[in-house]
Amino acid sequence: MQLCYQNTQITKLVNNWHTQGKTVAFVPTMGGLHQGHLSLIDIAKQKADKVIVSIFVNPAQFSKNEDLDSYPRTINADLTALKVNVDGVFIPNIKQIYPKGISKYIDVGKIGQILCGRTRPHFFNGVAQVVEILFGIVRPDVAVFGQKDYQQLLVIKQMVKNLSLNICIESGEIIREKSGLAMSTRNQYLSKNEAKIATNLHKTLSYFKHEILQNKKVYVLNELAKLDLKQHFKIDYLEVLDANNLKQITDNTHQIVILSAVFLGSVRLIDNIIFKKG
């Protein structure tokens, strides 16, 4: 495993692999690695000859009142987890990514203005900005993202299409704790009791899916699910949308996604369930 701290180092490494006819898969992360990240690396290993992981806590996707300063930074544990799994790790500092400061704007379109984009209007611009920069530095053939951040996944796919980037975007399913809680770096913020309460998010979404498949009215189910969630959380959103484009479902919708973001105390949790209509 090769460690690269400079843009020139990682670019040279990947160029050498490409010269040898090797394909390269890329898994961008902010560190705080868990089994969910490792599952994406497993997919990357299946899709390419070489795998690069980046660790960079991106300030552009945090607003002033969010957890940039307290976001878990566990670089030693992360490198231990990666040692036998990847070929290279890119650990840039902020000057490598934003040499002229954070100023570039990427229009992510309507898909970035709904759901998380409504209450975190800065977020997807920041994500798209850093991902485009990382793609330009690493120049992978394949990049792998998790479905837990489903809206982010679609935003990145749209960005790649808009910019005509020759990168195949792959996705990995949500990895869950035995309790059903979706694995997330921010789960470290939860107390033991809060972690138990947090499992109710997935339980509610699972029941919502079950009832949709019984052909019950979605708008009625949505209100009932919100009542259920309000017993445990402060709701940011709960919506049922077309999984292909995050538009409202119709009779012609084949794949559905139920998405939700909630607050448990100060911790923001997101989750989703994707399924075929039946």
Curated annotation (Swiss-Prot):
GO terms for molecular function: ATP binding; pantoate-beta-alanine ligase activity. Pathway: Cofactor biosynthesis; (R)-pantothenate biosynthesis; (R)-pantothenate from (R)-pantoate and beta-alanine: step 1/1. The active site is at H37 (proton donor). Pfam families: Pantoate_ligase. It comes from the Bacteria. Its EC number is 6.3.2.1. ATP binds at residues 30-37, 146-149, 175, 183-186. GO terms for biological process: pantothenate biosynthetic process. Beta-alanine binds at Q61. (R)-pantoate binds at Q61, Q152. It is found in: Cytoplasm. It catalyses: (R)-pantoate + beta-alanine + ATP = (R)-pantothenate + AMP + diphosphate + H(+). Keywords: ATP-binding, Cytoplasm, Ligase, Nucleotide-binding, Pantothenate biosynthesis. Homodimer. The reaction proceeds by a bi uni uni bi ping pong mechanism. This is Pantothenate synthetase. The gene is panC.
